[in-house]
Amino acid sequence: QWVTLIQALAMRPGGPPHLRITLIDDDAVFTSAGGGGGGGLHIVGQQLTRLAESCNVPFEFLPAPAISAGEFNLEKLDIRPGEALAVNFAFQLHHMPDESVSTSNHRDRLLRLVKSLAPKVVTLVEQESNANTAAFFPRFLEALDYYASVFESIDVGLSRESRERIGVEQHCLARDIVNIIACEGDERVERHEVHGK
């Protein structure tokens, strides 16, 4: 998504605006990507910076420390008056506990906070699967159906011997599947939902 945005801004009539991307380190995502402790976030920042330079887009990358589900510190995000704010939730919200796990409902709290910032645009990308509140057997069937499609898609693009494929399957998908099927309560952090929930 960021690559496409940078490329689109580069072609904007009148020249590209200054772009500042602040990414919050989601330990679950960046650890599975091989980074851990902000390492993956650093790699993403380097790649985006190189791309922006090659497209002549004035660019600033700000990594923000990971935040627990209950603490959102706006000062760490360095939101500046007068700037157009966009919020991108790419595979993030399903990691946050909702009212089915805790009465605190950190997901709702985060969404209300984002709304209070009056962003120009909010994008949301999540898996479409009923693996949040379903009982074990229906959740197992949902996971089987969803991940069968994911593996079929991977088959099209990567050979079975591909190191990238093996890494994704072992470090991302396998961990997610085990968490969805074998964990309950607070231990389950993969909580995919269907649209409209």
Predicted regions and their residues:
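Conserved SAM-binding loop of SAM-dependent methyltransferases across substrates and taxa
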Residues: 2-13
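Domain-level detector for long C-terminal conserved domains
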Residues: 15, 25-197
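Short beta-strand element of Class I
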Residues: 19-22
